[in-house]
Amino acid sequence: MKDSELQIDRSCHVLYSKPCKKEILAKITLHYPEVEREAVWEQVQLRYAELLSKWRTDLGGKKNFHNGTGGTYDCIAIMCFYDVCRDVVTFREMEEIEENLILPSFRKLRFVDINKPFWKKLMYRAFTTAQKRCDAWHDYEMDVTPYENSKPIYYEFTACPAAEFAKRFGFADIMPALCNVDYASMELLHARLVRTTTCVNGCKCDYTICGDKDPYVKEHPEYRDENGYRRNK
């Protein structure tokens, strides 16, 4: 099925991104013979359209910066792919899809070093700007703690549409594969993420961010919980 033929309300929703489609098709190619691939992809497309017809319509469509590559709607498409192909796709392959969407932008920023005050302050400003943009849409409810030189950056989401979607439609089990990319992205900036909970397994998604040389990192060792989430003690 052509993307243009997909029956979704484009006045309030957006289509999955081209990079997302490419990643999903690559996984379908990995697991299915050629004669089945088109039909499997169409199942994913139809599931996407079906669930969007039951989903909230206030996320801003193309106007909302969260709806681009690797964002809310790509996460929804990835969950639909998981729903159709869960019998063959692995957890690691699901992680790879989101990593391949998110990490290229961070790889371009390898020169950033959060251990240095200049970059740490610049990152903080980026988060405060993001909060203002979140406040305009009330999709991801974001709160950034005031900056302190001697402490890690801290912010949290108390609402996350991707998590909300996962819980509503029964995909909470695969959310760790989508959330874990936050750790990998920070590592590319000489930073570390310290997290204890997410909007799926708790009431918030917390982000404590410091340089990879900060003693705070050793004080909060990372582990994977029984559901596959990367977390910290």
Predicted features by range, described:
Residues A184, E222-K233:
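Short, cationic low-complexity segments
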Residues G70-R168:
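Amphipathic interaction/junction segments at domain boundaries or subunit interfaces
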Residues T196, G202-D212:
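C-terminal edge-of-domain segments
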